[in-house]
Amino acid sequence: VLRIAWFALVLAPAGAWAAVPHLFFSDLESGPNTGGESNAGAYVTVYGKDFGSARGSSYVTIGGGQAAAYPVWTDTKVTFQLGAAAATGDLIVVVPDGSSNAIPFTVSRGRIFFVSPGGSDRKNGGFSSPWRTLVKARDSMRPGDITYAMNGVAQTADDGSGWNTSLLVRNGGHPAAPKAIVAYPNATATIGSVNGPATGIRTAPAEGGHPDHWVIAGFVLRGQGAAMGLWGSNGWRIVGNDISCPQGDGAAGCFDTVESSALKFYGNHVHDTGKENASSQYHAVYFGTDSNHLDIGWNTIANVHGCRGIQIHSSPQSGEAHSGQNQYDIRIHDNVIHDTQCDGIILATVDPSKGPVTVYNNVIYNAGKGPDNPERTGGWSCIYVPGYTNSGSAGSGAVEIFDNTFYGCGTFAKPPYSDQNAALAFGGGSPDLFLRIRNNIIFQTATSLFPAGVPYLAIWNPSTRHVCAAADDCRWIQGSNNLFYGSGPPPANPNITGSVNADPEFVNVSQHDFHLLGGSPARRRGVDTVSAVDQDGVPRGGAEGTDLGAFQFTGQ
């Protein structure tokens, strides 16, 4: 119920929407169409919009064949069982008013197992003879296998591996045959504990192998320090989990990675992370050392103690001479991030010249609200790009920031130092790195420190080591077609053109509904970007033009 409720909140409409459904992502990308419950194969969950509040005559096709069963059907989430008619090909949701976009799915080989509180690890793990523990499942699975955790499954104690974790993972699947542990439809299943082991799920490479290519989906994940910590683990897919670490502290994150790449982090609710006086080095979501090829989308990250909502930061590891390089090929999109002690997002060590670094279709509000952490350090913005380099060559090229909505950024009124409160900030660490901003809405608010409104920008000149004035020819930020409101006129920097300076007319700011009203000056003021749809899946451009911010106006 928790997971369905928060996802519906993220996607809640602000009026009537187009009736044709839109798919965002699925938990599984492959699975068998036989075996498991009723010999009808794997259960798959898709997330999106406009599926309808009840199934009625709607259905799902996989490679042209209809699914066998539908235990969950809501407007934003559908769970179905593949069935014998499913084939490799396009996965499509069909409703009376039309068909969704397609996402690929592969019908593959693999076994299906079940874990239940009433099961026994001496049984065979079938639907009618389930195992009792996820440890048994972990130790028994082969590449391509799927285990479903039934309602009430709780792997909360230390698993006895010696790694201070509830579930240690040291082996893996293959790119075309991952291992998957998924919550059974409508089940609440838990891994980790806020008062138990340090980590809920922990990975560590073993001699002769790496814990690569896993799917973890639909769980309640908890940890005293981290709900999930990936080390040397590639190709993971973390989908639709409820993640929280209210006792977290230290140099870590409630979800964190080291030397782990090609990750998909989709549709998770990360909330209430860090204890009240947590360290500045503690973050909600932390993609760490040499973690590249990251796709971070459709998550809600909220109520963060310590410091950042999302931290991208690479630092050398002891005994690894070439570790800690700048990070690249990073997509952060379609997220809602709010109520963070420091920045909503920090892209600390990035190099877009090696692979794009893009931030788009996000809603970020009340980020950088303070108070001080014990170290009295941090930054207070919606997005901060320091330009650090801890190992290797400095970053260069453009960090692309487009089609986002930012509200109330950097409101901490008692920072320990100046020029770090803003909506967007650049630290000047590399003279060859810059921000390109397009189609964003930046709505700032007043504080006791900034009675005329918190600054829109804080862009440090790498040469002078001072913040650029609003009218400076400051080349470390460029772009066009942004709306600035709440802190006076827009920046006069000649590298920022086509700005709008007016109230964007959101539907309901007090309820954090940042959809646009029909008369909004943000309508039809954008330029084309690579973002074909908005955060709701509504197409951008065309006859209606491109609106500014994370949401396209839908006609009502």
Labelled PLM ranges:
Residues 17-57, 88, 97-113:
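Beta-strand/beta-sandwich contexts
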Residues 160-169, 193-207, 223-229, 247-258, ...:
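Extracellular beta-strand/beta-solenoid scaffold signature
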Residues 157-165, 170, 334, 355-515:
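Predominantly extracellular beta-rich ligand-binding scaffolds that present long acidic/polar faces
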Residues 178, 182-187, 209-223, 234-247, ...:
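Right-handed parallel beta-helix
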Residues 497-556:
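C-terminal accessory segments
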Residues 69-71, 155-161, 166-226, 247, ...:
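Right-handed parallel beta-helix/beta-spiral solenoid domain characteristic of secreted/periplasmic
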Residues 115-151, 156, 162-163, 520, ...:
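Acidic Gly/Asp/Thr-rich repetitive segments characteristic of extracellular carbohydrate-active
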Residues 18-29, 95, 103-136, 151-155, ...:
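Right-handed parallel beta-helix/beta-solenoid
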